[in-house]
Amino acid sequence: MISYLVLQLRFLFLGIAEKLGPKKEKAPAVPSPRLRYRVHGSTEPHGYIEVGRLSWGSIEKILANLNRPINEFENILDFGCGTGRVLRNITNSDQTNLWGIDIDSTTIRWCQKRLHGARFEHIDPNPPTYFNRESFDLIFSISVFTHLDERRQNQWLEEMRRLLQPGGILIASVHGEHHRELHSRELDMMSGFVFVDSKRRFFKKDGLPLFYQDAQHTKQYVLENWSRFFTIIDYVERGIVDHHDAVVLTKKCSN
């Protein structure tokens, strides 16, 4: 509880200092220290901006390897957009419809007020969403499946399959084997998927729901289980900012 209160005071004082401090011309919109911590795990503003930029760069690299430039896509969805730190980096989007969705109403309200060029909507923690079937030809989801248990993960994979157009691309990040904290034997005993329920405290520092914890996958688990929902095009180890593994998927023709 003490560490929680100390963190809240830090949010308060940093927020006051930033409001009273000098304003930089043409500086990118940056959320409050509290929201930066929620989506980035740190209050440091430069790192927040840079990780968002690098994450989008990682996605662009994956698409380039598929010979699918960003201007080829008409409807793009950022599933679990948070404060839009990745989506905001899409610049060549005049002919593209950009959407960001998240279960966090606070971050969505911030995006709606501060970020332009995309539509941001709050969604329920449980699928389905209100979008029509096959609404998007590109969906990306950074640092979402890294925090869901297996049941929720499968529910949202099913929903992403419903939303993705045939031939569309889904790029989702996972905590791969290099990131795991458990011994490999423990992962094997758990069939390659571990949900680490280590943040279930009364005072949860990040302000996110209690079900939002830490999930770790092996590559073999993803290949065997996610192929029930999609055709797996590629699995790029450390493909997102040299940290998360990137799973590259497309919709099965039979669907």
Where in the sequence are the language-model features?
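Class I (Rossmann-like) S-adenosyl-L-methionine-dependent methyltransferase catalytic domain
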Residues: I2-N75, T83-P128, E150, Q155, ...
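Conserved S-adenosyl-L-methionine
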Residues: G80
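A short acidic, Gly/Pro-enriched loop at the edge of an enzyme's catalytic core
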Residues: T129-I139
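A short SAM/SAH-binding and catalytic strip from SAM-dependent methyltransferases
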Residues: L138-R151
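A short glycine-rich, Lys/Arg-flanked "PGG" loop and its adjoining helix->strand segment in the class I
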Residues: N154-P166
